[in-house]
Swiss-Prot record:
Predominant subcellular localization, coarse grouping: cytoplasm
Listed Low complexity bias regions: 126-135
Reactions catalysed according to its record: [protein]-C-terminal L-amino acid-glycyl-phosphatidylethanolamide + H2O = [protein]-C-terminal L-amino acid-glycine + a 1,2-diacyl-sn-glycero-3-phosphoethanolamine
Source species, domain of life: Eukaryota
Enzyme Commission number(s): 3.4.22.-
GO molecular function: cysteine-type endopeptidase activity; protein-phosphatidylethanolamide deconjugating activity
Originating gene: ATG4
PANTHER family: CYSTEINE PROTEASE, CYSTEINE PROTEASE ATG4
Protein name: Cysteine protease ATG4
Functional note: Cysteine protease that plays a key role in cytoplasm to vacuole transport (Cvt) and autophagy by mediating both proteolytic activation and delipidation of ATG8. Required for selective autophagic degradation of the nucleus (nucleophagy) as well as for mitophagy which contributes to regulate mitochondrial quantity and quality by eliminating the mitochondria to a basal level to fulfill cellular energy requirements and preventing excess ROS production. The protease activity is required for proteolytic activation of ATG8: cleaves the C-terminal amino acid of ATG8 to reveal a C-terminal glycine.
Annotated organism of origin: Pyricularia oryzae (strain 70-15 / ATCC MYA-4617 / FGSC 8958) (Rice blast fungus)
InterPro entries (UniProt xref): Papain-like_cys_pep_sf, Peptidase_C54, Peptidase_C54_cat
EC top class, as a word: hydrolase
GO annotations of cellular component type: nucleus; phagophore assembly site
Family: Belongs to the peptidase C54 family.
Length: 491
């Protein structure tokens, strides 16, 4: 019997690998078109020069690259836009100008201050089977697919949080209605043992994992700089990863996300999280943990209010703290309305971008890059997929105890992408504002971005009684509520 089961598992594994090759092949770059590939505000083409060492060692930009080939949009003196779009006003372009030389690895170790760079609607569906992705999606070392090596190095340096298994049990809720809030597949999985807690988040934790990814990369930029690449400052990277260990002692562990979700967001253990609940957890956990890092969340509206933002970023009226802006929104009913394609793509081209969590039917991904499509007016968005179950990331009081395999499990060089028309409209968008100059550049960017705006910045928060607000705000972008039943975002 055991051999039969093992044989069936092998057949299933290889069968799924074949399906992956047919239906979800590794994306390749067109060297003739050589369209720029973007990763969180940095632009890459095949002309981008880079000196690559072996994996795990430093990857350093050549001097030819630093000035004009690998650059955030601000360094090109232009507002991020799609190639067919018209340029915005000269004032907006000027507002985005900044230093053209990326920090050296040594400078990246200093407290980061970068002036030109950084920083619902959910109904539990049947869970997406994580084994489809986890058995094959990232096991093989991919070739470069014609992509700029500097782009792949940047992509690989983004922190990637995934499903984990074998961690300390997360107790089940004693509320009799808790099981009804889970997806049907999760109810089947947990039916056999109603008493045991959750030792894996496979099938329900993908939105939490993409939220962790967004937060981790924000902290990475604050601590090590946007130009940090794998192999640089390994001790600092281990310290950062320890904050996200799968253990209640780690401040950003899945245990603490679930605990806050249960206490403040009405989310039971084992229940999927939506973008709004994830934003509230990030806000609470980060503000309780970090001394010089703040989180500003817009709630369920796309409006950013300058007076409220400054109360978070500069509470004493003098010292500006790096601040993560979280915007939970919905840009359509079943699919993203095409009027938002340009502006949503441009958010990933902004130098303050720290990515998008959510945004795929029946699952959540962490989107970090974009490339214009050759076939139409849309774009392909590059993402990190959390649906890949790995052993739990342990907690160590001494981060030096993390092994290379522990660190490697939080990175991947394998690209995944989807067309923007395939995205789910429910998402969490993040921007990291490092200082006041960065804040003013970001305001100008979102004001002049191409396409229908998905973000509005106003001076005063009407809830404070200092202004009447914008009556049209509610009509401009559909809002997000975790209790709305139109959109499926599952783990």
């Amino acid at each position: 019997m055991d051999s039969a089961v093992a044989g069936a598992a092998d057949i299933g594994r290889y069968g799924r690998r074949i399906v992956r090759m047919i239906w979800d092949p590794e994306p390749t770059n067109d060297p003739i078109a050589n369209r720029p590939a973007w990763c969180l505000g940095y632009e890459y083409t095949l002309e981008t020069n880079i000196t690559s060492k072996t994996k795990g060692e430093d990857s350093k930009l050549s001097t030819a690259t630093s000035s004009d080939q690998q650059r955030p949009p601000a360094q090109a003196n232009k507002v991020p836009q799609m190639p067919s779009a018209q340029l915005p006003t000269e004032a907006a372009a000027t507002a985005l100008s900044g230093n053209t030389t990326p920090p050296t690895p040594e400078a990246a170790l200093e407290p980061t201050k970068i002036t030109s760079q950084p920083a619902a609607i959910d109904t539990p569906p049947d869970s997406v089977d994580s084994s489809f992705d986890s058995s094959m999606a990232y096991d093989d070392v991919p070739d470069d697919g014609g992509w700029p090596p500097a782009f792949l190095n940047d992509f690989e340096s983004r922190i990637w949080m995934t499903y984990r298994s074998g961690f300390e049990p997360i107790p089940r809720s004693t509320d009799p209605t808790a099981s009804s809030r889970m997806s049907f597949a999760m109810r089947l999985k947990t039916m056999a043992d109603q008493q045991a807690g959750f030792t894996t988040d496979s099938g329900w934790g993908c939105m939490i994992r993409t939220g962790q990814s967004l937060l981790a990369n924000s902290l990475l930029t604050c601590r090590l700089g946007r130009s940090w690449r794998r192999g640089q400052a390994p001790d600092e990277e281990r310290k950062l990863l320890s904050l996200f260990a799968d253990d209640p002692r780690a401040p950003y562990s899945i245990h603490n996300f679930v605990a806050h979700g249960a206490a403040k967001c009405g989310k039971y253990p084992g229940e999927w999280f939506g973008p709004s609940a994830t934003a509230r957890c990030i806000h609470a956990l980060a503000n309780a943990t970090e001394n010089s890092f703040r989180v500003y969340s817009t709630g369920d509206l796309p409006d950013v209010y300058e007076d409220s933002f400054m109360e978070v970023a500069k509470p004493d009226g003098k010292t500006f703290h790096p601040t993560l802006i979280l915007i939970s929104t919905r840009l359509g009913i079943d699919k993203i309305n095409q009027v938002y394609w340009e502006s949503l793509t441009a958010t990933l081209q902004l130098p303050q971008s720290v990515g998008i969590a959510g945004g795929r039917p029946s699952s959540s991904h962490y989107f970090v890059g974009a490339q214009r499509s050759d076939e139409d007016q849309g774009s392909y968005l590059f993402y990190l997929d959390p649906h890949h179950t790995r052993p739990a990331l342990p907690f160590h009081e001494d981060p030096q105890l993390y092994t290379p395999s522990d660190v490697d499990s939080c990175h991947t060089r394998r690209l995944r992408r989807l067309h923007i028309r395939e995205m789910d409209p429910s998402m969490l968008i993040g921007f990291l504002i490092l200082d006041e100059e960065n804040w003013h550049a970001w305001k100008s960017s979102v004001k002049h971005v191409q396409g229908k705006s998905i973000i509005t910045v106003s001076e005063h928060d009407p809830s404070k009684g200092s202004a009447s607000g914008r009556p049209s705000a509610i009509d401009e972008v559909e809002t997000l509520s975790d209790d709305d039943g139109d959109t499926v975002l599952d783990g």
